[in-house]
Amino acid sequence: MAIQVLPPQLANQIAAGEVVERPASVVKELVENSLDAGATRIDIDIEKGGAKLIRIRDNGCGIAKDELAMALARHATSKITSLDDLEAIISLGFRGEALASISSVSRLTLTSRTEAQTEAWQAYAEGRDQAVTVKPAAHPVGTTLEVLDLFYNTPARRKFMRTEKTEFTHIDEIIRRIALVRFDVAISLTHNGKLVRQYRAVSDDGQRERRLGAICGTAFLSHALKIDWQHGELSLHGWVADPSGSKALSELQYCYVNGRMMRDRLINHAIRQAYEDKLGDRHQPAYVLYLEIDPHQVDVNVHPAKHEVRFHQSRLVHDFIYQGVVSVLQESGAETLPEIATAQPAERWQPENRQAAGGNHFATPAPAAAPRPASTASSSWQRQEPVYQKREGAAYQQLLQTPTRSEEPPLSPASVTQNDAPALSAHAQSFGRVLTIVREQYALLEGKKGLALLALTVAERWLKQAQLEPGSEGLRPQPLLIPVRLKLDKAERDAGNRCSELLNQMGIDLKFDAHHVMLRAVPLPLRQQNLQNLIPEMLGYLAQHQDVTAFQLAQWFARQSASEHQHWNHSQAITLLAEVERLCPTLVKSPPSGLLQNVDIEMAMNALKHE
């Protein structure tokens, strides 16, 4: 078959396959055109779920007579004129495809009048070449679009339309979403001659909340927490439901970027992460949020239906949204779940060969840290030292040949040498080869002295303590993309001011003003922690203890920091041990109590022998 240019109607129908998914898609495109035209009132009439009639009437600026035919042509628009405009889009529409695509799969009539005209004009396209006919009509200033018999000429598409009730439900949802972002526009929705929705234009905050309640329900309004978060050219405002409200309203999620309705994965992930220790995995947060960003920093031309965007600084936007939502939840006093057990995906098998020590696992993005149990500041200062539990069971105890100990003494420099753990020879370079992971928390090692069991969480704590010891030059502060605003009491603020030199040595940058404390930088090992909980607890610890040294503070951080792995796998254990061997050679030569335990395999083998 020879290459040829497609006829206009066929080309438009192909484009309609992306733009016009169902009647609700038509309503969305046409209402957005009305909003771009500056309309303050929009009336939507629907018949038979949109299959028979979709009529959109507005009081916008209208379309001039000599532009009506062009309005129904492909790639014709008044919203952008150059590539620079495309890179900073502020209108809802910009491609110039909607009207041409819709007219190719329906009988579309466009009637419009501008304020400068004394009469209105009507245009419609017909035939294979989509020729446009223009004739006089009666109409006030504004535009009316009628879409009759949607998909009449594409039976396959019409066959896949759902019931009238289902299609209208989708249309109703589109109108709800638009009404939530354009409070200044009056909107009415009629179905089969019956008025279904009517939203009056509102201006003040009280009226906005009434419209919010009318759309989202009084249940959401009663649990709504208002958010107003600003950083540079980023702005986040709207409402989020408290955890108890979110559990009952998990399907209520509305998000907008520069006034455009979105279903963006990055935004949803940031919001879900903010609720992670409040809701767990079984519930979804409920929210109505509006993100304002410099149009040059976001690309909206990445999705056929414009449901997704691409941020040029995605990590900055993610952290900004996360910090904003976390702050309002903390200020409201929302309770944290006591403990969250998250199921981890099955890990792929990794080869047993150890990579050379020297690779720093902090240099690669770390998995999300397991949430720590919530605690008040006062209780956290008096928290008991971590208790490392060994697995119970007769077979396990026989294998280890040691009595089970329920507690480990506090970490101290002396504990590295004063213990009854097996001492390795002075020339030992490693713990040995990782054979397997036992019960997701221990590594079974094979070394020169035989088999040994190593507690991975204990090794991780020792490593973190070594990484947090500042030395003579201090730790390098790592600036946060979004400074964290902390809520501190007087004792914590006083401790921060008193220990400013120690905090600088630890790489922690705090800025105090009259009302707030901003955390601007932390050392690299703390970047993955929940800083809004950890730093206030640290200041509380300093308030309760005088003359704390950098070593003691590093030890405290190592104990209080959440583990980066709730369930360890083979490759993670290898990476951890390589770092421990590089940074903590003393642990290899003389492991402290609770870190390493020899396994007497001979006894187990003898028990299996038969005479």
From Swiss-Prot:
What does UniProt give as GO cellular component?
mismatch repair complex
Keyword entries, A-Z: DNA damage, DNA repair
The answer on whether this UniProt entry bears the keyword DNA repair reads yes
What are the GO MF terms of this UniProt record? ATP binding; ATP hydrolysis activity; ATP-dependent DNA damage sensor activity; mismatched DNA binding
> Which residue intervals make up region (Disordered)?
353-387
Q: Which family does it belong to?
A: Belongs to the DNA mismatch repair MutL/HexB family.
What protein does this entry describe? Answer: DNA mismatch repair protein MutL
List the top taxonomic levels of the source: Bacteria, Pseudomonadati, Pseudomonadota, Gammaproteobacteria, Enterobacterales
